[in-house]
UniProtKB/Swiss-Prot annotation:
GO biological process: DNA-templated transcription
Record's protein name: DNA-directed RNA polymerase subunit beta
GO terms under cellular component: DNA-directed RNA polymerase complex
Lineage of origin: Bacteria, Pseudomonadati, Pseudomonadota, Gammaproteobacteria, Legionellales
Domain of life: Bacteria
GO function terms (MF aspect): DNA binding; DNA-directed RNA polymerase activity; ribonucleoside binding
Subunit (UniProt): The RNAP catalytic core consists of 2 alpha, 1 beta, 1 beta' and 1 omega subunit. When a sigma factor is associated with the core the holoenzyme is formed, which can initiate transcription.
Pfam family, one: RNA_pol_Rpb2_7
PROSITE patterns xref list: RNA_POL_BETA (PS01166)
Keywords linked to the UniProt accession: DNA-directed RNA polymerase, Nucleotidyltransferase, Transcription, Transferase
Gene that produces this protein: rpoB
């Protein structure tokens, strides 16, 4: 079997801490970028890096090409599209987030206006004038590097949609429509845009057509409207049987196969010999047919009765007179045969039908068709589409043509055409976007074939019939909608072009386009607020495919089949990860290796297998292409040459799992984790967990809150590094080089010479994100993991983000767990934790709250942000500066003022006394009321940042200016560093050129003809080096160039500083009526406490019930107390045994770390340590980690980093075996069963049985008790019912529901119940009375009528029933 060999090169972070892998399979191909589906889709939409001539017909280019050229109504002027270009965004992503702007770029389109000479008589008319111009078409949102959009300052993700592919689909009603259970077949042509066309059978086997789900019509009406006569229709759908009249006898041309299954109504003889083949009354069988074929019978004499009741295939006309004797599709009668004989007509053509496989469906439909001509058919369709409107010939023709045959109204799209052609058996995948006559005919023919038992219906849940519509495509559709709105307006204006000398800019109003785009990104169901709790949740959100949304399904109507796992999901869509609840199965996640092809179908990679030998060639297969292949799983046993060893191989074929021989196998899976999504691939020992629990595990990992200090999982799957780097939360080196400078907020890299191209700077400056608020209020903070002087490669991790540790995803903490009951505190999944976890801040998290204060211009005057607030004491203002804004670093609690603000009050009539006092004391403060921003209840924390936005044109306050200064200082610092490095680089090259050269003169004591030495250069100032004159002209020229470079560098730096300064000091574009906005960011520290929700990675979740002092916790014999106690009853019934295996392997990992720490403390030699590490990493003799490539220092750093435990990787479906876990435990000198004797911390007694103890990775989820706890005394009430509102956000009350009423009734607590239902709820009078009574010290209750009873009365009256209360 092939096993994962070591990579030759390790990244900077990887060298510091290797993860020991148990994987047996080699990774044939690297995992593609996890965000590629988003990035590629939008890249194809914009096509910014593609030349105009090379642009593909997709995205913006396709939208413009489909709408332009726009012609005027008269046809004398037209607008043509030439090309487009995107400008530079005004602000970068970080600035857009801070300022609340949309990260977008201006779109300019080159439009050509062509005016024709309307007076000319030529056709086509000559061109009179051409005007070209760049027209601004609004702003197009840009995608960030991590696949998100910044819209109005918040990060959003556009989720891909899984919708029904355009094309044709055949299905049946499963026997539900008709009581007999008969299957009614139907076909539906689904275009990308345009009217749907349905064909369906009714219980009487007639074929009907519906357009856009309207009233059904016989299908022959549609065929007549297409120009087919009855004769043509029968000719298309039926074979004919020809009958000749010879010597008074009827002879039919015999095709023996057509007689099969009929009952002979007369004796059939061989004409030559008279031999009897079939007796009258016997059924004609295959044996009889063989005899007829053998005797080579050409025709058959039939009695006249045999023809009666048969259907004519052609019109019967007397050629001499032109008289119609019968129409096609008429039945043959005695009279008709007589008439034909008398008119001398000797040939009759009949249609061939039988009940088995040549049904008479179209013939029956023709009989119920009321129309007789094309015009009548068109009128009938017009009546169905536009009921009540009087039809005219022109209107009917135009309507029918516009339905399916005009490109503007109908488009199958390339996908639809491909699917359509493949389904109806057309060879080519290309064709027009509109329907043709032949298309409609072929669909009806295929439908009739299926009804006749030839062919199968389609499976609509097959991933070959569902395709993914990604961001780019959805944006393109919205853009097209906007352009079509523009087109209507432009057409009207184009008629004015000749009279007024207008330019393209005057004709086009870009508002509808921007509005459509803005609406899509701002409020579409698929443009969602990004899930940003941790890096995994972001990656998963971008890889999500949803069946909901515009043009998709709705929760209520989606049945079980759509939600279920389908065989085609294998390797394309994860069978595990989907939400619990109403959306289950409708929202899915892409599998790890999945991608979409050019048609939008999901593909999965497979290795090619030739003659039972596996090659390294990888092909991507869609569900359509996969059906006929034999595909083996990736864990098939192979020999060294890649030949399959087993005699029978489990494989997938025709959407079934079966066994087959190796020579039949065409493909093989790439990797065992190919089936699952990113989140599920992070669960170790997933193969030992029940699917329902794995679903919860993958969903709960996305809710893990970033802890104060991230800690890598001891037991992982090897996917952690990939997820962390692709998520974009950590800083990854764009180019290799040397770390020049590093501090907490930025990293400066001096780039390698071979990685800089001309015109690029040789410096990379990475500004780290510090304590930034995520969409879910968690904290985004980056910490550098490199030191000055470190050499790094492109792609190395330079700084860890939230939930990453040394470049690996780290969502939680490794805790020492014991599976045992403890005084009932872990009953029903409760969790018991040690006080040490709280004390060590293992699960302390930082949450950042954004509080906003807005000063508006009101009718009574302007609101003002100030520290001068009426009736507020000095102490309340102690945290504010002179501008009235809180200081950074201030610790605030609920109710504290953050931003002082006063609002003008309406002028009230003053009494004469007040007027006198006002005149004496000049008291003016009473004109304003305090409307300051205060800390909301239940919140306290530290102010970490303040942003002040001032309207353009208003004077900035001192605080706003100081924030600007800080910002400018940061920009200046970056530019100074960049300039320093680039200057050093230039001077280094200058010194290299000058050394040992002969000078002709220069500053200082340099004599002509002397050589230049390093000492001389050290003494002379660097700026004067350029004044040194040299004999060699070529070198002089190079020096001159370097001198110019230095000048240009100075100018460039000044320009960049001024540009940044302009951006920073310009006023802000605020909403109308807003003068100033102050945003205060509070960092709230949340320690773990009872009521918080925790979970493992295997769906084992619970709520903390108690925090126990360390001395009371169960401890081992060496005194180590466990961190957390879980209930063992949570494992067997849930069937997530993965957590137990993880616990054992975690114990081994920690034990190995202890052994390494011991060796380091004993100062053992690097060779001894290397030998021990070799045993750990390459346990089965296969070199997975190449320790030889590390020098002694790197080895010792690695060993030091392993003190806390050796991280293990057990890949999904390819993980550690039980034997391997035992061998690791033994290597760490631990018991092989993973059980330990524990001692009760309170009594000092040993527990009766040994307990499973080990290390498990636990997460703290974003369901914190602080966010949920809530209490209310008085508050707001609902307007109609006057009952208190519900929920924490509305400061609501506790619901006293139906069942609580029953409980009080059962106790007979009548007064308590009355109080609950009246004065504590919606008895408005009683509420105020009881308040007054309590104030007066009188505790009696006087309940009145509950308001909800009055509402009930009003509702009954609304029904027209007079109801009144009788008062005694």
């Amino acid at each position: 079997m092939a096993v994962a060999e070591a990579k030759p090169q390790y990244s900077h972070a990887e060298k510091k801490r290797f993860r020991k892998s148990f994987g047996k399979q080699t990774d044939i191909m690297p995992i593609p970028n996890l965000l590629e589906i988003q990035l590629k889709s939008y890249r194809d939409f914009l096509q910014t890096d593609t030349k105009l001539s090379e642009q593909l017909n997709t995205g913006l280019h396709a939208a413009f090409s489909s709408v332009f050229p726009i012609e005027s109504f008269s046809g004398n002027a037209r607008l043509e599209y030439v090309g487009y270009k995107l400008g530079e965004p005004a602000f970068d992503v970080r600035e857009c987030k801070l300022r609340g702007l949309t990260y977008s770029a201006p779109l300019r389109v080159k439009i050509r206006l062509v005016v024709l000479d309307k007076d000319a008589s030529d056709d086509p008319k000559p061109i009179k004038d051409i005007r070209e111009q760049d027209v601004f078409m609004g702003e197009i949102p840009l995608m960030t590097d991590v696949g998100t959009f910044v819209v109005n300052g918040t990060e959003r993700v556009v989720v891909s949609q899984l919708h029904r592919s355009p094309g044709v689909i055949f299905e049946h009603d499963k026997g539900k429509t008709h009581s007999s259970g008969k299957l009614l077949y139907s076909a539906r042509i689904i275009p990308y845009r345009g009217s749907w066309l349905d064909f369906e059978f009714d219980p009487k086997d007639c074929v009907y057509v519906r357009i856009d789900r309207r009233r059904k019509l016989p299908v022959t009406i549609l065929l007549r409207a297409l120009g087919y006569e009855a004769e043509d229709i029968l000719n298309e759908f039926f074979e004919t049987t020809c009958c000749h009249l010879k010597n008074g006898e009827y002879h039919i041309d015999l095709i023996p196969q057509r007689l099969r299954g009929e009952i002979a109504s007369f004796d059939i003889h061989v004409p030559e010999t008279g031999e009897l083949i079939v007796e009258q009354g016997r059924r004609i069988t295959a044996r009889h047919i063989k005899q007829m074929e053998k005797s080579q019978m050409q025709d058959l004499v039939v009695p006249r009765d045999y023809l009666i009741g048969k259907t004519l295939a052609k019109n019967i006309i007397d050629t001499s007179t032109g008289e119609f004797l019968a129409q096609a599709n008429d039945e043959i009668t005695e009279e008709l045969l007589d008439a034909m004989a008398s008119h001398g007509i000797l040939q009759i053509d009949m249609i061939y039908t039988n009940d088995l496989d040549h049904g008479s469906y179209i013939s029956d439909t023709l009989k119920i068709d009321p129309t007789g001509s094309q015009l009548e058919a068109l009128v009938e369709i017009y009546r169905m589409m536009r009921p009540g409107e009087p039809p005219t010939k022109e209107a009917a023709e135009a309507l029918f043509k516009n339905l399916f045959f005009v490109e503007e109204r109908y488009d199958l799209s390339a996908v639809g055409r491909m699917k359509f052609n493949r389904r109806v058996g057309i060879k080519s995948d290309e064709g027009p976007g509109t329907l043709t006559k032949e298309d409609i005919l072929s669909v009806i023919k295929t439908l009739i074939d299926i009804r006749n038992g030839i062919g199968m219906v389609d499976d609509i849940d097959h991933l070959g019939n569902r395709r993914v519509r990604s961001v780019g495509e959805m944006t393109e559709n919205q853009f097209r909608v906007g352009l079509v709105r523009v087109e209507r307006a432009v057409k009207e204006r184009l008629s004015l072009v000749e009279s007024e000398n207008l330019m393209p800019q005057d004709l086009i109003n870009a508002k509808p386009v921007s509005a459509a785009i803005k609406e899509f990104f701002g409020s579409s169901q698929l443009s969602q607020f990004m899930d940003q709790v941790n890096p995994l949740s972001g990656v998963t959100h971008k890889r999500r495919v949803s069946a909901l949304g515009p043009g998709g399904l709705t929760r209520e109507r989606a049945g079980f089949e759509v939600r279920d796992v389908h065989t085609t999901h294998y390797g394309r869509v994860c069978p595990i990860e989907t939400p619990e609840g109403p959306n289950i199965g409708l929202i899915n996640s892409l599998s790890v290796y999945a991608r979409t092809n050019e048609y939008g179908f999901i593909e999965t990679p497979c290795r090619k297998v030739v003659n039972g030998r596996v090659t390294d060639e990888v092909e991507y297969l869609s569900a359509i292409e996969e059906v006929d292949q034999y595909i083996a799983q990736s864990n098939v046993e192979l020999d060294a040459q890649g030949n399959i060893l087993a005699d029978l191989v489990p494989c997938r074929h025709q959407n079934e799992f079966s066994l087959t021989t190796p020579d039949k196998i065409n493909y093989m899976d790439v990797s065992p984790k190919q089936i699952v999504s990113v989140a599920a691939s992070l669960i170790p020992f997933l193969e030992h967990d029940d699917a329902n629990r794995a679903l919860m595990g993958s969903n709960m990992q996305r809710q893990a809150v970033p802890t104060l200090r991230s800690e890598k999982p001891l037991v992982g799957t090897g996917m952690e590094r990939i997820v962390a780097s692709d998520s974009g939360v950590s800083v990854v080196a764009k180019r290799g080089g040397v770390i020049d400078l590093v501090d907490a907020s930025r990293i400066v890299v001096r780039v390698n010479d071979d990685e800089t191209t001309a015109g690029e700077t040789g410096v990379d400056i990475y500004n780290l994100t510090k304590y930034f608020r995520s969409n879910q209020d968690t904290c985004i903070n980056q910490r550098p993991i490199v030191s000055t002087g470190d050499r790094i490669q492109r792609g190395d991790v330079l700084a860890d983000g939230p939930c990453t540790d040394m470049g690996e995803l780290a969502l939680g903490q490794n805790l020492l767990v014991a599976f045992m009951p403890w005084n009932g505190y872990n009953f029903e999944d409760s969790i018991l934790i040690s006080e040490r976890i709280v004390h060590d801040d293992r699960f302390t998290t930082i949450h950042i709250e954004e509080l906003t204060c807005i000063a508006r211009d009101t009718k009574l005057g302007t609101e003002e942000i100030t520290a001068d607030i009426p009736n507020v004491g000095e102490s309340a203002l102690s945290n504010l500066d002179e501008s009235g804004v809180v200081y950074i670093g201030a610790e605030v609690k609920a109710g504290d003022i953050l931003v002082g603000k006063v609002t003008p009050k309406g002028e009230t009539q003053l009494t004469p006394e007040e007027k006198l006092l006002r005149a004496i004391f000049g008291e003016k403060a009473s004109d304003v009321k305090d409307s300051s921003l205060r800390v909301p209840s239940g919140m306290n924390g530290t102010v970490i940042d303040v942003q002040v936005f001032t309207r353009d044109g208003l004077e900035k306050d001192a605080r706003a200016k100081s924030i600007e200064e800080e910002h400018l200082a940061r920009v200046r610092k970056d530019l100074i560093d960049e300039r320093r490095i680039r200057e050093e680089d230039i001077y280094h090259r200058v010194s290299h050129l000058l050394l040992d050269k002969v000078a002709t003169g220069g500053p200082g004591s340099l004599k002509p003809g002397s050589k230049i030495t390093q000492d001389y250069l050290d003494k002379v100032e660097r700026e004067k080096w350029f004044d040194i004159r040299i004999e060699d002209d070529a070198i002089s020229q190079q020096l001159e160039q370097l001198s110019k470079q230095l000048e240009l560098l100075t100018k460039e730096m000044e320009k960049r500083f001024n540009d940044s300064r302009k951006k920073i000091i310009q006023g802000d574009d605020l909403a109308p009526g807003v003068l100033k906005i102050v945003k205060v960011y509070l960092a709230v520290k949340r320690r773990i406490q009872p009521g918080d929700k925790m979970a493992g990675r295997h769906g084992n979740k619970g709520v903390i019930s108690i925090v126990v002092p360390v001395e009371d916790m169960p401890h081992m014999e060496d005194g180590t107390a466990v961190d957390i106690v879980l209930n063992p009853l949570g494992v067997p019934s849930r069937m997530n045994i993965g957590q137990v295996l993880e616990t054992h392997l975690g114990l081994a990992a920690k034990g190995l770390g202890r052994k390494i720490a011991q060796m380091l403390d004993e100062k053992q030699t690097p060779e001894a340590i290397k030998a021990y590490l070799e045993k750990i990493y390459n346990h089965d003799g296969v070199q997975r980690v190449n320790l030889k490539c590390l020098n002694d220092d790197e080895l010792m750093t690695l060993a030091d980093n392993l003190r806390a435990g050796v991280p293990m990787a057990t890949p999904v479906f390819d993980g550690a075996t039980e034997q391997e876990i035992k061998s690791m435990l033994q290597l760490a000198d631990l018991p092989a069963d993973g059980k330990t004797v524990l001692i009760d911390g309170r009594t000092g007694n040993k527990f009766d049985n040994p307990v499973t103890v080990g290390y498990m990775y636990m997460l703290k989820l974003n369901h914190l008790v602080d966010d949920k706890m809530h209490a209310r005394s008085t508050g707001s009430y609902s307007l109609v019912t006057q009952q208190p509102l519900g929920g924490k956000a509305q400061f609501g009350g506790q619901r006293f529901g139906e069942m609580e009423v029953w409980a009080l009734e059962a106790y007979g607590a009548a007064y308590t119940l009355q109080e609950m239902l009246t004065v504590k709820s919606d008895d408005v009078g009683g509420r105020t009375k009881i308040y007054k009574n309590i104030v007066d010290g009188d505790h009696r209750m006087d309940p009145g009528m509950p308001e909800s009873f009055n509402v009930l009365l009003k509702e009954i009256r609304a029904l027209g029933i007079d109801i009144e209360l009788e008062h005694d």
